[in-house]
Curated annotation (Swiss-Prot):
Function as written in the Swiss-Prot or TrEMBL entry: Part of the phosphoribosylformylglycinamidine synthase complex involved in the purines biosynthetic pathway. Catalyzes the ATP-dependent conversion of formylglycinamide ribonucleotide (FGAR) and glutamine to yield formylglycinamidine ribonucleotide (FGAM) and glutamate. The FGAM synthase complex is composed of three subunits. PurQ produces an ammonia molecule by converting glutamine to glutamate. PurL transfers the ammonia molecule to FGAR to form FGAM in an ATP-dependent manner.
EC number: 6.3.5.3
Catalytic activity of the protein: N(2)-formyl-N(1)-(5-phospho-beta-D-ribosyl)glycinamide + L-glutamine + ATP + H2O = 2-formamido-N(1)-(5-O-phospho-beta-D-ribosyl)acetamidine + L-glutamate + ADP + phosphate + H(+)
Keyword Glycosyltransferase: no
Pfam families recorded: AIRS (PF00586), AIRS_C (PF02769), FGAR-AT_linker (PF18072)
Biological process according to GO: 'de novo' IMP biosynthetic process
Annotated active site: 47, 93
UniProt GO molecular function: ATP binding; magnesium ion binding; phosphoribosylformylglycinamidine synthase activity
Protein name stated in the entry: Phosphoribosylformylglycinamidine synthase subunit PurL
Localization terms from the record: Cytoplasm
Keywords from the named record: ATP-binding, Cytoplasm, Ligase, Magnesium, Metal-binding, Nucleotide-binding, Purine biosynthesis
Binding of Mg(2+) 2, residues: 115, 266
Organism ancestry: Bacteria, Pseudomonadati, Pseudomonadota, Alphaproteobacteria, Rhodobacterales
Annotated positions binding Mg(2+) 1: 91, 528
Length: 721
């Protein structure tokens, strides 16, 4: 079959700029074949090369005494003691989920799970951070239902508990939803596997499901803006099979026990191309592939299609040749394909053969580590003016609370997480619903806590403070359950980086994130960048999602209790009443003005340590973020089924979103001891109310807990289900 001619239109359709194509001509000294053009397109797009973000990603703190493996591998790895490690990462599947919600979300879950078990870890927890357009938008309901069903359909069948996440709505996501999937797994520190190939002449083995035409060009599609041709992109969305993935995991983990694996890589974005190139490049080797040996489920597939297919549930491995028979037997037992499709070579070449013909012969290193890198122009985002006294609204406290909990942004998300299996594997210690999730480390007394956080309104208004706040809120959510924060993964979702104002958001957010993870000892060990989240020139809110992991060590107790009638309600931290960019302004007054709240990282660290160090006095705890004191107190009361009385009455005190604050419930006879401890630690602590009865009282306003709970538990489904 004759390959298509290389024309300017073909080059543009592959997402390559004219200067990038000129660079290809310079590198290889000739016109590329169609297959070679596809390979360059896949490896040089934003999704695989990070060409617009790499400069700034290097500024992030990624190391620490607890870090075993930082960015650059399939996932990050952190030591949790006793020969155990946690492996985790967050990654986006935004563009596919907007085009085909169910499969886009499902394969996003599948991809992140493969990243974890490729390292030798058994997945133990998942989360997802979802962003959709306004509820009334004509696509939102379809997207919400499809994405949630896809996340649940894949994760439930695979058998990993969903322990947390977030769901938000904003008109800026009308044209681009965000689906950020997180997974974590456990591995013994002496059984970690990496992707760098080693040894010349070693067999390159294809593992898992067969290759089809689904997902061809998916990575390139994920690196471009949307326009009115979006429906034509549907064939670029992958199709997942969670039962095959489950078998692939079991076979892979069993294979690793044999000692046959030299290196291993999952096939994700750009499929066979990216996995082979990354393995070779990290090992300083070349790779030769014979495509007629690739297991195929469709007839007459071309070299181009096989190299760029993103069919799911596939892996690539470099194998010890003397253990081939043993390795093959493992995969045959699990009814999965096992095929030697090539070998490592000494030369820096990526050589692709198909039926005896050379389809690609390229310098391998130029496809990966030497790919183009841009220093995009950027404009520093000028923070808006702070609210003046005249700008600050007032509202009846209960009316304000009702407005918040009737919005799908702040209503209970039961409709979402009840579709997910949250307890499979039997180690879930805290299910989704309030703050961080938690799982027990099986066979030990240790527990791992997980959270996912970002407030995009803050990041748009003030990227530096918004970036800090995303990390700080993750830190607080871990401290609030008694876990010591260990490390983070970032999922950086932004618009078109070729626009200086968008690049300015990115640069500012990374500056804030970097400062925060350094100050709070939470290095970034893995992550993902998703750019070009725009439709017809309209960008999403900048959404740098932070996933974080914390540890409750053996011998420590987590803070997982509930408030009880008679408990005192105490507020940790200083209240100023900052309403700029607040949930109240947005949901009630349709305003997004004022600056984002300032984040003092020293105070964040001090207050978080105070919570962890005084866990014996604390019966229940939550951090204060969106919705301020009022929403946090209601959520504690609603979770416990007991009323709450709050002494404050003014709007800024009740709904302000000052940072570094927590609400804690404690016994009346222990409140004084907690006050003394706070004084010794230099931490502001004040009594702001008590848990009692069956009503929620704020100032002179009140409503029954039953009425408010009904609103809280039904509003989400009524809006979007």
């Amino acid at each position: 079959m004759q390959e298509p001619a290389i024309t300017p239109e073909v080059i543009e359709n592959h997402g390559l700029k004219p200067d990038e194509y000129d660079l290809i001509l310079e590198i290889i000294g000739r016109e590329p074949t169609f297959t070679e053009l596809g390979i360059f397109s896949a490896m040089w797009n934003e999704h695989c090369s990070y060409k617009s973000s790499k400069k700034w990603l290097r500024t992030l703190p990624t190391s620490g005494p607890q870090v075993i493996c930082g960015p650059g591998e399939n996932a990050g790895i952190v030591d949790i003691g006793d020969g155990d490690a946690v492996v985790f990462k967050m990654e986006s599947h935004n563009h596919p989920s907007y085009i085909e919600p169910y499969q886009g979300a499902a394969t996003g879950v599948g991809g992140i799970l493969r990243d974890v078990f490729t390292m030798g870890a058994r997945p133990i927890a998942s989360m997802n951070s979802l962003s959709f357009g306004e509820p009334a938008h004509h696509k939102t309901r379809q997207l919400v239902n499809g994405v949630v069903e896809g996340v649940g359909g894949y994760g439930n069948c695979f058998g990993v508990p969903c322990v947390g996440g977030e769901v938000r709505f904003h008109p800026a996501y009308n044209g681009n939803c965000l689906v950020n999937a997180f997974a974590a797994g456990l591995v013994k520190t002496d059984m970690i596997f990496y992707s760098a190939a080693s040894g010349v002449g070693m067999p390159v083995v294809y593992l898992g499901a067969k290759t089809g035409r689904d997902g061809v060009g998916g990575a390139t599609m994920a690196s471009a803006e949307f326009d009115d041709t979006i429906e034509e992109k549907r064939p670029t969305v992958q199709v997942g099979d969670p039962f095959t993935e489950k078998r692939l995991m079991e076979a892979t983990l069993e294979l690793m026990q044999t000692g046959a694996v030299i290196s291993i890589q999952d096939m994700g974005a750009a499929g066979l191309t990216c996995s082979a190139v990354e393995m070779g490049d990290k090992g300083g080797l070349g790779v030769r592939l014979d495509l007629e040996k690739v297991p195929q489920r469709e007839e007459n597939m071309t070299a181009y299609e096989m190299m760029l297919s993103e069919s799911q549930e596939r892996m690539l491995m470099v194998l010890k040749p003397e253990l081939e028979a043993e390795a093959k037997a493992v995969f045959e037992k699990w009814d999965l394909d096992f095929a030697i499709v090539g070998e490592t070579i000494a030369e820096d070449r990526f050589l692709i053969m198909h039926n005896g013909e050379v389809k690609a012969d390229l310098p391998l290193s130029k496809l990966s580590s030497s790919a183009p890198e841009y220093d995009r122009p950027w404009i520093e985002v000028e923070a808006p003016a702070a609210l003046t006294d005249a700008d600050v609204p007032t509202i009846d406290p209960i009316d304000g609370l009702k407005a918040l909990i009737s919005s799908p942004n702040y209503a209970g998300k039961q409709w979402v997480y009840e579709q997910y299996d949250t307890t499979v594997m039997g180690d879930t210690a805290r299910r989704p619903g309030l703050g961080g999730g938690m799982v027990r480390v099986h066979g030990t007394d240790k527990k791992l806590a997980f959270t996912s956080d970002v407030t995009p309104r803050y990041v748009k208004a003030n990227p530096v403070e918004g970036g800090k706040q995303a990390v700080a809120e993750a830190y607080r959510n871990l401290c609030a359950v008694g876990a010591k924060p260990l490390a983070t993964t970032d999922n950086l979702n932004f618009g078109n980086p070729e626009k200086p104002e968008i690049m300015g958001q990115f640069v500012g957010a990374l500056k804030g994130i970097g400062e925060a993870v350094s100050a709070l000892d939470m290095p970034i060990v893995s992550g993902n960048v998703s750019l070009y989240n725009e439709t017809d020139g309209q960008a999403i809110l900048p959404t740098p999602t932070i996933g974080a992991v914390g540890l409750v060590a053996a011998g420590e107790e987590p803070i997982l209790g509930e408030a009880r009638d008679g408990h005192v309600l105490l507020l940790v931290g200083e209240t100023i009443g900052h309403l700029g960019q607040s949930a109240l302004l947005h949901e009630v007054f349709n305003r997004e003005d004022g600056d984002a709240p300032a984040v003092d990282l020293e105070i964040e660290k001090r207050n978080g340590e105070f919570i962890r160090n005084n866990r014996d006095f604390i019966k229940a705890c939550t951090d204060i973020s969106d919705g301020g004191l009022a929403l946090a107190a209601f959520e504690l009361a609603e979770a416990a089924g007991v009323g709450v009385q709050i002494d404050a009455s003014d709007t800024p005190t009740l709904f302000g979103e000052d940072q570094a604050r927590y609400l804690v419930a404690c016994n009346f006879d222990q409140a004084e001891a907690l006050m003394i401890a706070a004084g010794q630690a230099g931490v502001p602590l004040e009594t702001v109310g008590k848990f009692t009865g069956d009503t929620v009282k704020m100032g002179g306003s009140e409503a029954t807990l039953e009425e408010l709970s009904q609103i809280f538990r039904t509003s989400f489904a009524e809006a979007v289900a």
